[in-house]
Amino acid sequence: ATFRLNNMIEIIQNWNDYILDSKYLPQRSATFLINENNEVPEINVRNNYKGIDQAYRKPIQLRLIQDIEDPNYRQIFILPAASYNLYDGLSLGLRWYNRTILPKPLHFNLEPQYALNSQSPVGRGSVIYNRWNETSNLFLQRFGIAGNYFSYDQGLFYRRLSPYTIFAFRDNSNLRKNKRQYLTLRSVHVTRDKALAQVDREPNYSVYNLQFNYSDNNLINFYSAAFNAQLSSAFSKVSAQFEYRKLFLNNRQINLRFYAGLFLRNGPNPMSSV
């Protein structure tokens, strides 16, 4: 059944039988709702609303502590948050996030806090956007950014910002296979307040990271491999890690792990004397 709504009030109800692909519903300005009374069982009902004129947006609902998702609202969950830092002391605040059991395209997590010792606002936050493609070997693209702001000394603060991108691959012709490949591009940028009476031996820095992960996660035979490359103004290195696990019939298992790394360049940062 298709329900046509006006200001969230039902005005027309249509029953549509034998829709194999798509059907045109002539209406210039309206909001459509399908499967309102759950005649057809489904898990994900959050996309059952569609505003034709794009003016319709689900109302925002604030909930204290995470609860069962309500598909009629854009829910934001609130939790008390606390952290401790030697220079900030006890920091108190609220965590605002929208993560639910079922994944969403857009996730955010914001934790603004107030530090009692430094008497300054501090906190952390992250935003993640997921893009799925169920018909391709590249089944997931994830774009995210995370950051925080805290004290590292009396009256001195640091800022850390880390944007990243993840490409996830699988064999789309056989979804029963557990083989996965992940390509991650990430960078970490740290800036700090500089003390006037102190020579800074660890100045602001940035690290760029390229990582490839392969895994075949099975109960009896497990394989994984990871290749990592890091580059900064002070060093550059590459590393590799391999792991194999075998489960036997007597419930015993053997786990083998190999790791190797090499610094291609490891010297003082040319900016350390500035």
Predicted regions and their residues:
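Solvent-exposed serine/threonine-rich low-complexity stretches and specific carbohydrate-binding patches
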Residues: 3-16
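Extracellular Ig-like/FN3 beta-sandwich strand-entry sites
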Residues: 27-31
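Short, solvent-exposed aromatic-acidic interface loops
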Residues: 10-12, 39, 147-148, 190
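Surface-exposed loop/interface segments of Gram-negative outer-membrane beta-barrel transport/assembly proteins
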Residues: 171-191, 200-202, 272-274
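A glycine-rich phosphate-binding loop feature that marks nucleotide/adenosyl-phosphate handling sites
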Residues: 49-53, 183-187, 261
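Exposed aromatic-hydrophobic patches
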Residues: 13-26, 126, 164
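C-terminal outer-membrane beta-barrel translocator/porin domains of Gram-negative envelope proteins
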Residues: 80-82, 140-155, 160-166, 171, ...
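Outer-membrane beta-barrel initiation region
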Residues: 5-7, 22-24, 34-140, 155, ...
